[in-house]
Amino acid sequence: DTYYRICFIDPFQGTVLANYAKSLGATKAYCLAKQGDDYSVGLVNYFVEAFGAENCVQEVFQEGTSDYSSYVTNAKSNGCDIFVAPVSTEAAALIIDQAATQDLGMPILAGDTWDSNVIVGAAQGKDNVKIYVTTFYQEGGNAEFDAAFKEWINSDSVNLENNGGNDMVAAVSVMGYDAYYVALEAIKAAGSADPAAVLEALPSVNYAGVTGNIAFADGAKDATRDVAFIKYCNTETAVWDLIGEQGIE
């Protein structure tokens, strides 16, 4: 009962993904989740709820799975026209390989975990793979932050290695930055670093973050978020292209 969360949450993200799938003209979705993974299973469930269970084929894979060929085959054989896979980047890279090998023939949708240079690296050169993600930030949204982040990444070879070998600005990095400063604002408001005082001050924080304004509605522990960025993986340039913003209305 002591958490506060500044990112958008899965009920919102699942609905955004479903709305975007519909905007692409999708009518039947293949949904793949990792068994026992709360994020993966939960986001699929929220997508299915918004898209319509009668329009979805659902499967799960086990921990340690390395061959995803059967899942790609099942998506195609079931006549699906969108492939939803909110899974880890490790699993994603393998799914992308299979999608390219078998010529999946339908867009892949995923959540914020896929907003990573691991994904664009895995997809580079695979022009028969179309990937869209929902996420918190698009590089270029805040030039001052982007420049400072890239300077820091390039200042140390360890930083560069930890960022996947390049200075791409991942949305999770920006979210971590904003979370730090929301906590700092709460400490300032409390006038103390005492945990109880900071916890009491957090609900009143209103912070203009890199990812947008961050505030908590009365009694809420999740920040109010009403829009997500939709990005497309450019397999030629190995960067994320901004498609636009998507809400739940």
Regions of interest found by a model, annotated:
Residues S157-V174, V182-V239:
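Segments of small-molecule ligand-sensing domains
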Residues K34-G36, Y137, A186:
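Residue-level signal for short, function-critical loop segments
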Residues T2-E63, D81-I82, A171:
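An alpha-beta-alpha
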Residues Q13, L17, G25, Y39, ...:
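Stable alpha-helical elements in mature extracytoplasmic
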Residues L43-E139:
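Extracellular/periplasmic bilobed ligand-binding domains
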Residues N19-T27, V48-A53, T73-C80, D97-L104, ...:
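Sec-exported extracytoplasmic/periplasmic mature domains
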Residues E59-F61, I214, Q246:
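Generic detection of short hydrophobic beta-strand segments and adjacent strand-loop junctions
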Residues A99-Y177, Y232-E236, W240-G247:
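Extracellular/periplasmic periplasmic-binding protein-like sensory domains
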